Structure formats: C-alpha cells, structure tokens
Amino acid sequence: MSENKLFCAIVFLTSLFCSTCSQGTRFVHSAALDAERRYNIKWGFDESTITFEIEVETRGYVGFGLSPTGAMSSSDIVIGGVLNGSPYLLDYFTDSNRKVHRDPLQNYELLYGRENDTHTVLAFSRNLQTCDDNDKIITGSTVRVIWAFHAEDVGESGLVYHGMNRGRKSLRLLNPGTGPSIPAGTAFFDLQNKEVPVPHKDTTYWCQIFRFPEMKKKHHVIRIEPLIQKGHENLVHHILLYQCDSNLNKSEVNRGHECYHPNMPDSFLTCETVLFAWAIGGEGFTYPPHVGMSIGTSIDPVYVQLEIHFDNPSLQGGIVDSSGLRLYYSPSLRRYDAGVIETGVWVSLYHMLPPGMTDYITEGHCTQECLQESLDSEMPSGVHVFAVLLHAHLAGRAITARHFRQQLELQPLASDDQFDFNFQEFQPLSQERLILPGDSLITECRYNTKGRMNMTWGGLSTREEMCLSFLLYYPRVNLAKCESLPEIAGQLKFIGVTEIQEPVTTWPFVIKSPKKYSNLSFTEAMDKYKWTMKKGKSFNDIVRKLPMNVRCSKTGQDEWSIQGMIVSPPEVRSEQTSTAVVACRKDSAIQCEHSLALLLTACLLLILQTCLHL
C-alpha cells in the first residue's frame, strides 16, 4: 500500500510540475525604458505568446502599452499594481481622443505581482495575436512601447493622472538582436566629441570627422557601443558612423560642423556608407564570432564621420556634450572580414515624393546585372548577410528589403512595418542569408507626406528622403553600392514637360516648354504642378514601371562596368512564404482549451484523493 501511495504521489507531483513548467517563460531580453532606470522590463516569447515582467520604482499603479505612433491615442494599454498585498491587472485601450476605456476582452493574463518598500513588480502574458481590435498585434517590426506610473494605486474613483511619470521607447520585441559577449580586457578606442556646444534649438545634427588609429598590422573590430555623457541620456537621440573617402584632407580630422548645413564642408559629403548605427536605448552591436570589421590594411576605412542627433525639446541653453562611440578590436583575427553594401534608391533629386500622400511607395533595385558582374568576379559562391539596417528619413513609415532569385521572391532579408526614424539599428538576422550572383534585391519604402505642401526630394537632410538598406555581410568584396534611380524623362512627362533647355549648364536643370514651366527648374515645375492624392497615386504607379539607371560602384570612386546602364524593372513573382501572424482562433477552440485545463485539474485532484485513501 505504501508503494501505491508513493507511486500516486510521484504521478501527481510530476503532472503538477509539468503543467506549471508549461506556463513558465525565460526572460532572455531586457530594457530600461527611461534614462534613470526607474522603469525596467524583461520579456520572453515563443511562436504564439509573449510574457513580460516589469519592475518600476513606485508602490502605486504602473501602466504599460503598445502605441502605433508613440503617443497616447489609439493605444493598447495594461494597468496594474499591488493593493493591500493583492496584485491586480486590467486591460485598457485609448481612442483617437486619448480617452481611456476598459477593454471588454481582457487578453492580458496576470502571472504574479509583488512590491517592497520602493518597487512594484508585475508579470503578465498575452498572445502575439489576440484577435481583439483594441489590442495591437506584436510582430518582428518596431514596437513603440509607452509607459507610465503613479505613487497611488487605482482606487474606487479610478485612475489618477500620472503627470510627468511617463515616456515612450521603440523596441523590437521579437527581434531584439542580443549579441554574444566579448572577452574581458579587449582593447578599444573611442571616437568622441570634445565639449560640443549644443545649439539652443529642439533638433541638431552634429557631424565630426575622425581618423581611425594607425595599426601596424590587421585587426578586427568585434563590437561597437555608445558612449553617452552622463546626464545626456535623453539628449543624445541617435548616432551614425559613416565611412569617408580615404583621400580626405587630413586638415578635416577632428573638425566638427552642423550636419546638412549650407556651409558644411564639401568633404563631409564623401561620408556616405553607414558602418554602424545606434539609437536611444540601444546597447551597441557585437559581430558574430566568425566575422569582424577589418582595420589596419590599405583597403580598410581610414576616415569616418560621426553624426549625432541632439534632441533638445525644452530648448535648454549652455549644454556641452562629449558623447561618441567605443570600438573594441582584437589582433586575434576572425575567419571573415565584414563588408557593407548600400542598396536601394540612389540619393538624388530624381527621387521625389508628391505632397499629401498617405501611402507612397518607392522601390530601389540592386539589380541582378550588378550582383552578377560583381559577385562573379569577386565571390562566385556568394556572400552571407548577417545584419541589415533599414534607413529612411522623417516621411518613412515602412521598409522591406526584398530578395529575389531567378525572379522568384524569397523571404525578405528584413522588414519593418512600423519604421521609426529615431530608432535605427542594424538588425541581426536569426539566420544568415546567402546572396548569389544573379540574385536581385528591392528596397521597398512606404512614405506619408500628408501635411507637406511641396514635393519631398531625395537628399541628405532629414526633411528630404532616402530609401536604403545597408547589408552587413561576409566575406568582403569590392562592392559598395548597388542601387537604382528612375529615369527623369518619364517623371517630367507626367506633369506635361515636353522639352528642357540644352545644353544643361545649371543644376537643377531648366525647363524650356511648355510655356507654363518655361525657365523654371524641374524642381520648381514639379512643385508648381497641382497635386492631388489621385494624381499622386497615378504618378506612383508610373514611376515604379519606368526604366532605371543602375548604380554599381566599388569602394572609393571606382565603378563596375554595369554602372550607368538603363534597365527595366524586373518582372517578379512571389513565393508567398512570408511569415504570417498567428491566426485567430474560434471561440469554441479557446473554450475547448479551458475545458481541457479544467478536466486536467479534476483528474489531478481525483488522483490525489485516491492516493490519500490508499
């Protein structure tokens, strides 16, 4: 009989343990949502569910939400706390007027909650796709997380306004890009501003040229991370590191200037290829164990430009900043040298977006002709992409780096349907992707120009636009840019231009006829045209089918022979293999799950009761 009791106890405890473990989640990712680290989150996920643990410096309520824009309106919110020793959690949403409503469908499940003298901790989970119109679907794209807290719990009278205890942070919850650690004591050098005076305005982009340290032999950079001056965590919004022309004048080194200013030195314009990108809240980028960025050889970067975006909405004066980047490097060489290929739309005034458009699509082609010639010559077996940076400016809303082989579309290299200009980092790929000679790539960008009165032009300023994907790959080949640009003639024909003044002696060039555009530059003519959303849509459809000019350039000023060729956009077909969000389930299926759980619980209790009577 004692053996039967022991057997029953083992069965019961094993069943209980298994049912408990199935609900457990390992929090492998974490982030501080504010600069003072008062609000911290951890999370983990599987193919259908995400689980959060939040720790906040308060004994009152805490709010956590997912927003389409980073603002309060139209957000998916959960509010909870610990009141009189009992944790609570409620699912809310806000309407377009920011009014808070309790969600009829409570899709967030409270797992546990506790508090001490200073902090509140809550853990909760939800499905990635809840099938609730008031909840946001969580995907691999950028997620704008909003947060708030208050010193008091939610009482009978409802929520108390949180005041200034609030904020937002963009994260990639399903693609956080956790990298491997590097050995302690790894050597490093810093690229750091020296007491730069931050102007008395809300937004400033500061550029400075640096020279990499001279190396007697080849080394590999294995990690790059931000150096943010203490107290400036909310001031320094993002940092970009560009490779410059290796023939840059040495007198430019350590010279700083406001970026994109009319008086910015021309030499700064040679710094185009992004080597690294960091955005507020990020923790840097670590190269895979078999790859590093080569420095110290004749073909490696020598001069670089550091671009820092200062965000000063309160217009504080008298600020000086010494932020920058730290690059860790090692003489222990890895198997492969990393390279960067810039793909997308060639930055030019020929890239133009009509005003007033809620969804305008631009496509930049890295053509099969360019990849065929360059990779056949340098690496016939292809190159492996391990990280991607998707890049646009303020009008950008979504970007996808599409991949084709023999005109058949494969899975995208990277995609972000909720692009945030202020959150740009290299996204490590979960699996490396092979690019073969003859493959082709399309960087597809979606823009919103609603509220703009004139054309938006391709250019360097943040009010101008870009559509680029920077691919980190190995082994390095001599291919720096693989881009395209739609021909201008077809774009001008749309607004009725029939002739330009020749010879062309000015830029932008001047229109000759018809009379209504005579002696206007082509940019002035485009602005003069009476755009409507319908006309903008027709223009978009035409531009995407126009012949395009191919850019296929090597490092420096050299070019592959394909550069300048005029080709038509390829006819491609989709394989329909894109990863879909978790499908909504019928209520009956959910009820069945609950019934099964209740049945399992009843069985366990029956086993226990039987054991007690043996």
UniProtKB/Swiss-Prot annotation:
The active site is at residues 205, 391. Glycans are attached at residues 116, 249, 454, 519. CDD domains: DOMON_DOH (cd09631). Disulfide bonds join 207-259, 244-271, 366-482, 370-552, 445-467. Cu cation B binds at residues 391, 393, 466. PROSITE patterns: DOMON. Residues 37-150 form the DOMON domain. The keyword Secreted does not apply. Residues 1-22 form the signal peptide. Its EC number is 1.14.17.-. GO terms for cellular component: endoplasmic reticulum membrane; extracellular space; secretory granule membrane. The chain crosses the membrane at residues 594-612. Binds 2 copper ions per subunit. GO terms for molecular function: copper ion binding; dopamine beta-monooxygenase activity. It is an enzyme of class 1 (oxidoreductase). It is a single-pass type I membrane protein. Its cofactor is Cu(2+). Residues 23-593 are lumenal. Keywords: Copper, Disulfide bond, Endoplasmic reticulum, Glycoprotein, Membrane, Metal-binding, Monooxygenase, Oxidoreductase, Signal, Transmembrane, Transmembrane helix. GO terms for biological process: dopamine catabolic process; norepinephrine biosynthetic process; octopamine biosynthetic process. Cu cation A binds at residues 237-238, 309. Belongs to the copper type II ascorbate-dependent monooxygenase family. This is DBH-like monooxygenase protein 1 homolog. It comes from Danio rerio.
